[in-house]
Design a protein with these regions (language model features):
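Conserved NTPase motor "head" modules and their coupling/switch loops across ABC/AAA+ ATPases, GTPases
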Residues: 1-99, 108, 112, 116-127, ...
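Walker B catalytic acidic pair
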Residues: 103-105
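H-loop/switch region of ABC-family ATPase nucleotide-binding domains
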Residues: 131-133
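A short helix-turn-beta junction within AAA+ P-loop NTPase domains corresponding to the substrate/partner-engaging
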Residues: 141-153
Length: 153
């Protein structure tokens, strides 16, 4: 989970990460009640305004929105960690292997964060396709893979 990764200390900028969920309808109502109450409005609008499809997940760091508080590289790390967590959940539920494809992994990342992120990707035990122009920095980190092929274009 992201919480386990944060506790590992590999990405210290996430130490004060807070994740909140809003379910997409009023807290005081059950889903069916919310659907009923908004039916006329939804028909007029032509779409369903309440429901799980309206759920929001908000990430905050130091009590500020992550999107406005983190650098582009830090946001990239957070998003990839979310994907890795979701992939782990998908594998547990479906009992199927996944393929993780990441283009230009190293862009906007310093060497330390690139190595830490690659370590998390390797730990996910997925089939992985990575692209990048980083060369040696990325190559050193992925040498840990048992079945590794590098293609230089």
């Amino acid at each position: 989970s992201i919480e386990e990764i944060v506790k590992s200390g590999k990405f210290s900028f996430l130490d004060n990460l807070n994740v909140t969920f809003s379910k997409g309808w009023e807290r005081s109502k059950k889903l069916q009640e919310s659907f009923r109450d908004s039916l006329d409005k939804d028909r007029a609008l032509g779409y369903t305004s309440k429901g799980p499809h309206r759920m929001d997940i908000t990430f905050q760091v130091n009590n500020k929105k992550a999107s406005s508080n983190l650098s582009r590289g830090q946001l990239k790390i957070l998003i990839l960690l979310i994907f890795l967590t979701n992939i782990k959940l998908i594998k547990q539920i479906t009992q199927r292997e996944t393929l993780l494809m990441i283009d230009d992994l190293g862009s906007e990342l310093d060497v330390k964060n690139l190595r830490s992120l690659i370590e998390q990707i390797i730990l996910s035990e997925n089939q992985i396709v990575l692209t990048g122009i980083e060369g040696e920095e990325m190559h050193q980190s992925i040498k840990k893979l048992t079945n590794f092929t590098q293609i230089n274009l």
